[in-house]
């Protein structure tokens, strides 16, 4: 069995509307760049290989995006893999979003900056198009999800779904992505969100997204008991903006609420200890006949 490994990715979330809810986000995954991602490392990269930097703007606009892009170019040059290609894809895309805005600004004291920004925008746009074309045939799940989310590429979506049925992932990001693809099938959404929760580490942002998604899915099913249960799990795990008033008009007795809160404590502890599994969840639910 092939297992896709977690390559230390952070997230950029782009929200879309699904019929299951208007709360579950689609994700475009972008890389957390490695050792050379700090400013000092980028300076060294540029000193040693100016070709990685010279077509980019050097003013303060988009500095973080610029540094990430330079690091991604460097990492790809050092070791060209699908993961470094993916990192460059997302870094180029993020830089493009920033530099397009900067290119519209008319600097008062240094008008030449606009020319440089426009040049950087065009250069990186061409680079992005070329890399997107190059990776169209890839079966890397991160790249497939990129093409689906960014360009609504149905073929990429179908291949991503096919891979998820045959292979296991060990990154919750990928299960979250699959859950969003299954937006109209609440049962499959829940299955994949639970798989993602099983893999959670110390990532508050991912924890929030997965649990929000699970609460939303259970609410969509009108399974208010489990929506209430996971709302309390979220509170225990310090997820913000959990609204328990959603349950004031639903038929959950106070006795049942108390039992669910006890179960929530057990589940939250399992998640913290990275011991939450599908089997442990089923066992907890069966103990109270849920």
Feature locations, PLM:
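N-terminal Sec/ER secretory leader and immediately downstream segment
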Residues: 40-143
């Amino acid at each position: 069995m092939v297992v896709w490994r977690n390559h230390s990715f952070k997230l950029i979330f782009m929200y879309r509307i699904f019929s299951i809810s208007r709360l579950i986000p689609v994700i475009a995954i972008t890389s957390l760049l490695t050792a050379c991602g700090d400013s000092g490392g980028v300076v060294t990269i540029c000193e040693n290989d100016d070709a990685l930097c010279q077509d980019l703007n050097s003013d303060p606009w988009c500095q973080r995006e610029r540094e990430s892009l330079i690091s991604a170019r460097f990492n790809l040059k050092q070791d060209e893999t699908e993961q470094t290609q993916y990192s460059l894809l997302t870094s180029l895309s993020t830089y493009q979003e920033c530099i397009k805005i900067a290119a519209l600004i008319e600097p008062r004291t240094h008008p030449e900056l606009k020319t440089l920004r426009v040049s950087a925008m065009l250069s990186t746009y061409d680079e992005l198009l070329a890399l997107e074309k190059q990776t169209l045939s890839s079966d890397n799940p991160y790249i497939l999800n990129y093409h689906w989310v960014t360009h609504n590429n149905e073929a990429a979506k179908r291949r991503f779904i096919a891979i998820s049925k045959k292979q296991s992932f060990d990154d919750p990001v990928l299960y979250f992505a699959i859950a969003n693809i299954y937006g109209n099938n609440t049962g499959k959404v829940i299955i994949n969100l639970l798989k993602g929760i099983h893999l959670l580490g110390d990532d508050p942002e991912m924890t929030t997204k997965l649990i929000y998604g699970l609460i939303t899915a259970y609410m969509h099913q009108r399974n208010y008991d489990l929506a209430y249960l996971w709302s309390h799990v979220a509170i225990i795990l310090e997820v913000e903006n959990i609204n328990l008033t959603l349950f004031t008009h639903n038929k959950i007795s106070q006795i049942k609420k108390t039992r669910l809160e006890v179960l929530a404590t057990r589940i939250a502890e399992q998640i913290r200890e990275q011991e939450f599994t599908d089997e442990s969840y089923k066992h907890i639910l069966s103990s109270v006949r849920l």
